[in-house]
Swiss-Prot record:
<comment type="function">
    <text>Secreted effector that completely suppresses the host cell death induced by cell death-inducing proteins.</text>
</comment>
<keyword id="KW-1035">Host cytoplasm</keyword>
<keyword id="KW-0843">Virulence</keyword>
<keyword id="KW-0732">Signal</keyword>
<comment type="similarity">
    <text>Belongs to the RxLR effector family.</text>
</comment>
<feature type="signal peptide">
    <location>
        <begin position="1"/>
        <end position="19"/>
    </location>
</feature>
<feature type="glycosylation site" description="N-linked (GlcNAc...) asparagine">
    <location>
        <position position="64"/>
    </location>
</feature>
<feature type="short sequence motif" description="RxLR">
    <location>
        <begin position="52"/>
        <end position="55"/>
    </location>
</feature>
<keyword id="KW-1045">Host mitochondrion</keyword>
<dbReference type="GO" id="GO:0042025">
    <property type="term" value="C:host cell nucleus"/>
</dbReference>
<protein>
    <recommendedName>
        <fullName>Secreted RxLR effector protein 54</fullName>
    </recommendedName>
</protein>
<keyword id="KW-0964">Secreted</keyword>
<dbReference type="GO" id="GO:0033650">
    <property type="term" value="C:host cell mitochondrion"/>
</dbReference>
<dbReference type="GO" id="GO:0005576">
    <property type="term" value="C:extracellular region"/>
</dbReference>
<keyword id="KW-0325">Glycoprotein</keyword>
<keyword id="KW-1048">Host nucleus</keyword>
Length: 104
């Protein structure tokens, strides 16, 4: 419960990328209970990649952490709800688009 509340609090902050360091430390915990709040954190930071206020170094860091967090969440795929899986895949697509724009 504490982790869920902390995850939701991190979503509310301006820089959602901070949450990913926290997410990556949760691998050994019960991902089924934490999947929905973590998916919201991932979706929020994926949207943050489109803001122009991020510097290039912040955007790169956010992109990499979002991708790692999403893969960690999807590693528990069969046990997660379909909606959470869809959110995670959508975040990976957003990351791919952001990376393609940066290199183009």
């Amino acid at each position: 419960m504490i982790f869920t509340l902390l995850g939701l609090a991190l979503v509310a902050t301006k820089s959602a990328c901070i949450a990913h360091v926290f997410i990556l430390q949760l691998g050994a915990l019960d991902m089924e209970a934490l999947a929905t709040p973590l998916a919201k954190v991932i979706a929020t930071s994926a949207r943050a990649l489109h803001t122009r206020s991020l510097r290039a170094s912040e955007r790169d860091k956010c992109t990499n952490l979002t991708a790692r967090s999403t893969r960690a969440l999807l590693a528990h795929g069969p046990r997660l709800r379909h909606a959470v899986q869809q959110q995670a895949v959508a975040a990976l697509f957003t990351i791919a688009v952001a990376r393609r724009r940066r290199t183009a």
